[in-house]
Design a protein with these regions (language model features):
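Mid-to-C-terminal alpha-helical segments outside catalytic/metal-binding sites
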Residues: 1-13, 20-72, 77, 244-247, ...
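Hydrophobic faces of well-ordered beta-strands that scaffold small-molecule active sites
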Residues: 11-15, 78-80, 102-105, 130-134, ...
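Active-site environment of divalent metal-dependent phosphoester hydrolases
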Residues: 18-20, 85-88, 110-113, 139-140, ...
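Short, acidic/polar
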Residues: 57-69, 111-123, 207
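Active-site gating/metal-coordination segments in enzymes
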Residues: 76-77, 82-172, 176-179
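Distinct, well-ordered alpha-helical segments
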Residues: 88-95, 115-122, 143-147, 174-191, ...
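Active-site-adjacent C-terminal substructures of enzyme catalytic domains
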Residues: 196, 203-262, 268-274
Length: 297
């Protein structure tokens, strides 16, 4: 089975490439972990899971080669990180390829109002910067999703009308998981009904809870980052096929996972034909407000 043709092309909601920060969270993981094994990892804080990601790091640092790779797999645009203190690399990508790359700003609630101001200032640097992102497990110290430290950032996202991509579930890096339990999103979604939150990295092993929360809260969404398609949770796919057709979006996680593997496995997913367009394109355009960016593609 092959993936149907997608009008407008595929939108990849997570390309984890270095655009002004240490690649793939290595620096943060080393500061938090206590096991000897992580110190030996060279390219990924969960290298025991993403063993060959290092083979693709040189490609990940070459925007021209990335666009060629995207073209080969029908990817119209990809979301990359923007470091608020070193945004130049990402800004150069947006200027050279204005319809191919979009950006998200990593936030650190431990920094208080400094992070709030950095978020707003960075969003205003370029129209292609469309979201915030957070990895609670890699913050130092860790900050639970529903902690009051996050609330000023959530409020700012509401003001700016941007979604926040949030890691949920047991993380690959050898750090504690409690701060990322998806159940913590319940109160956030309740207190901030205008805030669009996109769950990242699977929510495993609480994917049944993720589905319940997605069904309950209109402002919660789910993306498939950090999982190869053959490992996508089946209950998430069942939800996408039915009541969650507007809620589930594709995120690839290159270079952690190769495009060859992602799109080689994609066609075997039990997704109904009428769901593909939303999953791979339309939902991302709507949630992240990409209409103007993509109109010239």
């Amino acid at each position: 089975m092959t993936v149907p043709s997608i009008t407008g092309g595929v939108i990849d909601l997570m390309m984890e490439i270095p655009t002004g920060k240490a690649g793939m969270g290595m620096k943060q993981a080393r500061a938090l972990t206590k096991d000897a094994g992580t110190d030996k990892f060279s390219h990924h804080p969960a290298q025991y899971l993403f063993k060959d990601a290092g083979d693709r790091m040189s490609l990940a640092q070459n925007p021209d080669a990335l666009v060629q790779m995207m073209d080969a797999h029908g990817v119209a645009a990809a979301l990359v990180a923007v470091n608020p203190r070193k945004p130049e690399g990402a800004l150069a990508m947006f200027e050279k390829y204005p319809t191919r790359f979009i950006g998200e700003v990593g936030v650190d609630p431990n920094a208080g109002m400094k992070s709030v101001r950095e978020l707003e200032a960075t969003i205003k640097l370029h129209p292609n910067i469309v979201a915030a992102s957070a990895a609670p497990c890699l913050l130092n110290p860790q900050v639970p999703i529903d902690d009051r430290k996050f609330y000023p950032l959530y409020a700012k996202c509401c003001e700016l009308d941007i979604p926040v991509n949030m890691l949920v579930g047991v993380p690959g890096p050898r750090v504690p998981y409690r701060c990322q339990h998806p159940g913590l999103l319940d109160e956030v979604a309740y207190f901030f009904p205008e805030l669009k939150v996109v769950m990242r990295h699977g929510g495993d092993p609480w994917t049944d809870l993720c589905v319940k929360l997605l069904l309950k809260w209109p402002n919660l969404y789910y993306s498939t980052s950090a999982w190869a398609p053959k490992h996508y949770p089946r209950n998430i796919l069942e939800f996408a096929n039915k009541r969650g057709k507007d809620k589930v979006m594709f995120a690839g996680y290159f270079p952690g996972i190769s495009y060859e593997r992602i799109f080689g496995e994609m066609g075997d997913l039990p997704i109904r034909e009428e769901i593909w367009q939303g999953f791979l394109h339309d939902n991302a355009v709507r949630v992240f407000g990409l209409e103007d960016i993509l109109k010239n593609t």
